[in-house]
């Protein structure tokens, strides 16, 4: 038997902890994919949740949306309940087929929430609609609980403003869908503003497509090399970006911060 991976051991430890703590409800996020993921060992769930599916982790999950959707839909349980976000037609077909095979009930949260939410970004309204629908199928959660939860949600690193002067937004977009959502949010909230773009990426991501989607939005781009063995070099990323925006410069993170930081008296945390 192969030795368990660190993630598998962490998952086992987490399940043991949840049992010892006698948790009422546990929210479990898949590590990668779903069908073959360690978290999918549980035989039954209150609800299986599938958020927006896009091209990511192709080395492990497949090279088409349908293949990735097949892996993701593996979390669907026999006779279970499934809530899914808005999906591409080809993805929804895979999810519907899996539900049919397992006699699972499918709810499509394909609108946006009507409640006020604390997070910027139109895609967050879509995410909130999914969360809203899930909560409606958990005993003891009222509409008022849902409303209060959405307005008080904090999600670091997702179109998060961390500074006012200048306005400094951080976002963890690392795949094609995330890049598209970031573009939508920038155009909606900062369409008439000068954008300075600081970016770094892992080499195993679809960085050329990410560059194609986001680079034209900026007046100036600085590329950095993330502190990670999987990192794409700043020079290589700058070369990819230059096809879509010539005003790009590969720098160190320290240099970049010197270029872009306001004076200390101007810094105000939001």
Tell what function each PLM region has.
Residues 2-12, 23, 75, 81-92, ...:
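Phosphate/pyrophosphate-binding catalytic cores of soluble transferases and nucleic-acid-acting enzymes
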Residues 2-5, 82-84, 169-170, 196-198, ...:
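Short catalytic-loop micro-motif centered on adjacent basic/acidic residues
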Residues 35-36, 42-102:
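Conserved catalytic-core segment of NTP-binding enzymes
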Residues 52, 87, 199-202, 226, ...:
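Cofactor-binding loop segments of dinucleotide-utilizing enzymes, especially the Rossmann-like FAD-
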Residues 88-98, 103-107, 167-168, 176, ...:
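C-terminal helical cap/extension that packs against the catalytic core
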């Amino acid at each position: 038997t192969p030795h368990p991976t660190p993630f598998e051991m962490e998952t086992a430890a987490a399940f043991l902890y949840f049992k010892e703590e006698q948790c009422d409800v546990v929210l479990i996020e898949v590590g990668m994919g779903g069908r073959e993921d360690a978290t999918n060992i549980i035989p039954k769930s209150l609800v299986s949740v599938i958020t927006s599916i896009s091209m990511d982790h192709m080395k492990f999950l497949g090279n088409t949306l349908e293949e990735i959707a097949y892996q993701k839909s593996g979390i669907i349980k026999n006779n279970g309940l499934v809530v899914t976000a808005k999906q591409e037609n080809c993805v929804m077909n895979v999810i519907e087929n899996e539900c049919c095979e397992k006699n699972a009930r499918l709810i499509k949260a394909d609108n946006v929430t009507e409640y006020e939410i604390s997070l910027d970004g139109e895609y967050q309204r879509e995410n909130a609609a999914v969360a809203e629908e899930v909560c409606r199928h958990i005993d003891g959660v009222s509409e008022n609980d849902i409303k209060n939860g959405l307005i008080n949600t904090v999600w670091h690193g997702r179109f998060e403003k961390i500074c006012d002067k200048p306005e400094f937004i951080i976002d963890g977009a690392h795949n094609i869908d995330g890049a598209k959502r970031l573009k939508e949010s920038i155009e909606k909230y900062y369409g008439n503003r000068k954008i300075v773009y600081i970016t770094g990426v892992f080499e195993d991501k679809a960085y050329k497509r990410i560059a194609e989607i986001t680079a034209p939005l900026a007046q100036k781009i600085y590329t950095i090399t993330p502190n990670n063995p999987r990192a794409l070099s700043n020079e290589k990323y700058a070369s990819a970006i230059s096809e879509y925006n010539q005003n790009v410069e590969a720098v160190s993170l320290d240099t970049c911060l010197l270029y872009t930081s306001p004076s200390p008296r101007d810094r105000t945390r939001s």
